[in-house]
C-alpha cells in the first residue's frame, strides 16, 4: 500500500523541538539570529556599534551612535511579555503543528497557564500567521471552490442565501507535481461577479490557471488576468474530481477543526 507523501512528510517532533528550544537561552539566541542574522543593527540608525545593558534574555542593546535602546522582543508579538520565551515558543509550536486546530482551552492545559493568557497567546500567534501570509498571491495552478460556514436555524433559509451562513472562498495553489503549496480562506460579501473579481485581484497572480466548478461568478477571475477553467461537476463524487482534490481536502480539514477544536464560532470574528 502506497503512503501519502503529504500526510507522512517529516515534521518537527516534540523531542526535536525541546532539544532546539527547550531553554530561555536557546529561544533568545533563535530570536537574535532571526532578527539580526548578520549581527546587531540599530532599528533607528542601522549602526552596528553597540553595547549590552543588563544580562540574560531581558538584556537591552544600546546603540553607541544614537543611544537608542532595544530588546530582542521589541516590535514583535512578544514585546513587553512577562511570560518565559519557552512558553511562547512552545505555544507557537503547538498551534502551528496542530493539523486539526487547537483551541485556547486546549492550549491552556498544554502550557499550564491561565485561560486569559492562553487566549491572548492564541489570538496573537494566529493573527501573526495570517498577517504574514495575507500579501502572498496564489499562482501557477489554483483549485477554487465556494463554501459556507454556519449551522441550522429553525424557520430560516437553507443553503445559499441563509442568514445563518457566512460565504467564503477556498483556494489552494498546487505546483507542477500536483502538490499543494498555499491556501486562501477568505470571507466574501457573496458569490457575485463583483465580489469574486475583487477577491481575485487581491489573492491571485496574473496568468494563474484557475480550476473551479460551474458557478457563474467564478468567471470573474479573468478580471485579475487569470485563465478560468470551469468544470460542471453535477452529481460527481469528490473521488471523481482530481482537479478539486486539495481544495476538498482543505474544506474537510476545516470542518474537522471547527467541530473538534472549537465546536462553534462567532461569525462576526470572520469579517
PLM segments and residue spans:
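Residue-level recognition of single "structural anchor" positions
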Residues: 1-271
